[in-house]
């Protein structure tokens, strides 16, 4: 465990083993959400995270699950912000000044580039890549790269999937699923039916699951 100078830790906050938190970060302070009235809420941080200079992470609110959760092995670069009630998975990278608003979910291995902004309640699927200064207003299915303001889908994160051990066949299936969803002019229900016909490979199931769990609608 490493805490550099001028780190502020409020609470209740639970921090796991092997974390490194750099100077001027504020961890577990009250949320500025106007609904928050001082109720007991908490922040949970897993193991082996690197939290760089000036990062802010707020606790949850009773209007949600009263918890903000950060998984393990994440890298939050300088001045990144994690709002109240967020759930950040494992192995996530938030580049300098990336910011996620309240109630956001970020899946494992996702990357948020510098100055990316994520609207409240948005879900970012696993292995997504969000481009620099993108504004994400709707949910992003697994494996997708998204750029722009508002963020629009570009392709699948091939390089990221290779690094994570997905086979060439699985990456091809993910690309086929992406094209059915975004490049064939199909309605969403039609695209889901067509993707289902690609089989039950875990990559396809993961892609479908991230679509079906969407509550804000997916980027289109």
What is each stretch, according to the model?
Residues 1-152:
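Structural signal for interior beta-strand "rungs" in well-ordered beta-sheet cores
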């Amino acid at each position: 465990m490493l805490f550099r100078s001028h780190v502020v830790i409020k609470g209740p906050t639970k921090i796991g083993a092997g974390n490194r938190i750099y100077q001027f970060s504020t961890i577990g302070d009250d949320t500025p959400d106007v609904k928050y009235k001082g109720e007991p809420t908490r922040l949970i941080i897993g193991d082996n995270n690197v939290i760089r200079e000036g990062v802010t992470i707020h606790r949850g609110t009773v209007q949600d699950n009263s918890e903000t959760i950060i998984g393990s092995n994440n890298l939050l670069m300088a001045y990144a912000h994690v709002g109240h009630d967020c759930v950040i998975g494992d192995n996530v990278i938030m580049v300098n000044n990336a910011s996620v608003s309240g109630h956001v979910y970020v899946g494992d291995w996702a990357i948020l580039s510098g100055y990316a902004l994520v609207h409240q309640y948005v879900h970012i699927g696993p292995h997504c890549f969000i481009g620099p200064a993108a504004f994400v207003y709707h949910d992003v299915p697994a494996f997708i790269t998204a750029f722009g303001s508002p963020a629009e889908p570009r392709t699948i994160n091939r390089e990221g999937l290779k690094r994570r051990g997905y086979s060439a066949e699985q990456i091809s299936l993910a690309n086929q699923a992406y094209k059915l969803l975004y490049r064939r002019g199909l309605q969403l229900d039609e695209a889901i039916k067509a993707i289902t016909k690609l089989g039950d490979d875990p990559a396809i199931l993961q892609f479908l699951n991230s679509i079906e769990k969407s509550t804000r609608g997916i980027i289109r």
